[in-house]
Amino acid sequence: LSSSSAASDVYKRQVLGQSYDLDLEQSQNAAIITAESIRRGLPTRAAAIALTTAMQESKLRNIDYGDRDSLGLFQQRPSQGWGTAKQIMDPWYSSGKFYGELVKFSNWKTVSINDAAQQVQRSGYPEAYRKHEPLAKAWASALTGHSPSALTCINRSSETTTVQELARTARRALAPKVATQVTGPTVTFTATDPVLVRAAVALTMASTSLGPIDRATVATTSWRADSEHYASWGAAAGPSASPAASGTGWVSGTVTARS
């Protein structure tokens, strides 16, 4: 999977056999949409359905316009009971409203992703979601931690932010199952489930629109930013980044913000 933004010369990429691209704004919104599914304890399929929907409705952009009074990532309408305009423009709120409606359908886990999206949206173009399914499934798998070492990025921005800000989405999604500790520019995520640690790192990396990162680790794998190329994940140099290697049962991951 990858994301790119030529205008700002800032890129993000994820590879799962092939490239799936999103730009930084899109990947940030994808992280929030996926994080809300994790927070609610929903399976990865729910995130894939929501991402498919937002890709079709808004191209994963939190737009303040649309058909009639439609707004936001999912083009929800205040006049149809989705919430106030201010609420709908909050990606966390709009994602939560989408999932709340999705799970009302008893067959949402068995019908196609396109059809599940259509049940919620009731679009005049009922097959329009289908073309987004491969991209949405790839990102959902990576951001929920089910596709290891999948996310990479290039960020040439000169802007910086705190690692606390970068990790905010992951913390909201995964606390208290994943412990978080900040030391200087580095946030460390620790849990007994490696999938959750991978999700925390991926959600933080997908938030790079807030500021660039320098490096990341998950257990015995590591990644370091390259200003010219999409860096690959590889074996961590030196001692393992994870206490699990010494038999404690705990797994750690880190993300370090560029300072």
Language-model regions: role of each:
Residues R13-D21, S58-I113, A117-Y125:
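Peptidoglycan-targeting cell-wall enzymes and recognition modules
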Residues L1-A7, Y11:
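Single conserved hydrophobic/aromatic residue that forms the stacking wall/gate
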